[in-house]
């Protein structure tokens, strides 16, 4: 069985990706980057989600000699011109501080009416092989931003995005419900046939 490295150390994301890929029928041995603690984090210097996903996937594939899958994702708010976008995880200035990022975003949108609170989650999922072969696919989840966080599931901005056609936020959905409609779920389900094509 081919080992496939998931280019993240985020435990929540590893769990989510394993579930999405397993549900899509991928049977490869999926291992998080946390299994390789000596490999340094990659600087996300790209200007798009796709560029950052490819940077991470290539770095891990080169360092391990194994195929690697990475994603870059974030929240794009219409009234903010697509921000925080690629800066979603460090919007408050502290990388990975979900609460601070969420608080800053809500403060920035405090005077914005419901009609102008449109946003979407975006995800670029990339596969890189040690020989340099690469593929990238993208997915989106459109919705509206609530004024206050609701729900305890998920992570990041999940407590404020209410997907189109839903009455609950992403953080109120079960993992299965969220994965079925999420930006990450869409992108990684699209990546599965690419993995099968390139890795067998």
From Swiss-Prot:
UniProt: substrate binding residues: 8-13, 73, 155-158, 178, 183-184
EC class of the enzyme, as a word: hydrolase
EC code: 3.6.1.66
A GO biological process held by the record: purine nucleoside triphosphate catabolic process
Catalyzed reactions per annotation: XTP + H2O = XMP + diphosphate + H(+); dITP + H2O = dIMP + diphosphate + H(+); ITP + H2O = IMP + diphosphate + H(+)
Essential cofactor(s): Mg(2+)
Gene Ontology molecular function: dITP diphosphatase activity; ITP diphosphatase activity; metal ion binding; nucleotide binding; ribonucleoside triphosphate phosphatase activity; XTP diphosphatase activity
Keywords in alphabetical order: Hydrolase, Magnesium, Metal-binding, Nucleotide metabolism, Nucleotide-binding
Keyword Endoplasmic reticulum in record: no
Residues bound to Mg(2+): 72
Family annotation (SUPFAM superfamilies): ITPase-like
Pfam families named in the record: Ham1p_like
GO CC annotations, alphabetized: cytosol
Cofactor note: Binds 1 Mg(2+) ion per subunit.
Residues annotated as catalytic: 72
Top-level taxonomic group: Bacteria
Function: Pyrophosphatase that catalyzes the hydrolysis of nucleoside triphosphates to their monophosphate derivatives, with a high preference for the non-canonical purine nucleotides XTP (xanthosine triphosphate), dITP (deoxyinosine triphosphate) and ITP. Seems to function as a house-cleaning enzyme that removes non-canonical purine nucleotides from the nucleotide pool, thus preventing their incorporation into DNA/RNA and avoiding chromosomal lesions.
Subunit structure: Homodimer.
HAMAP family the UniProt entry points to: Non_canon_purine_NTPase
Family to which the UniProt record says this protein belongs: Belongs to the HAM1 NTPase family.
Identification of the protein by name: dITP/XTP pyrophosphatase
């Amino acid at each position: 069985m081919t080992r496939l490295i998931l280019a993240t150390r985020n435990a929540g994301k590893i769990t989510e990706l394993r579930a999405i890929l397993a549900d899509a029928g991928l049977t490869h041995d999926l291992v998080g980057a946390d299994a390789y603690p000596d490999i340094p984090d990659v600087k996300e210097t790209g200007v798009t989600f796709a560029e950052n996903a490819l940077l991470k996937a290539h770095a891990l594939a080169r360092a391990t000699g194994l195929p690697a899958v990475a994603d870059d994702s974030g929240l794009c708010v219409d009234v903010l011109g697509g921000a925080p976008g690629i800066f979603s995880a460090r919007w408050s200035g502290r990388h990975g501080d979900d609460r601070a990022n969420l608080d800053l975003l809500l403060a920035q949108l405090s005077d914005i009416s419901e009609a102008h609170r449109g946003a979407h989650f975006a995800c670029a999922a990339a596969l890189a092989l040690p020989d340099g072969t690469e593929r990238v696919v993208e997915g989106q989840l459109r919705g509206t931003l609530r004024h206050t966080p609701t729900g305890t599931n998920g992570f990041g901005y999940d407590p404020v995005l209410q997907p189109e056609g839903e009455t609950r936020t992403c953080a109120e959905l079960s993992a299965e419900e969220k994965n079925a409609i999420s930006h990450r779920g869409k992108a990684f389900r699209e990546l599965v046939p690419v993995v099968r094509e390139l890795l067998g």
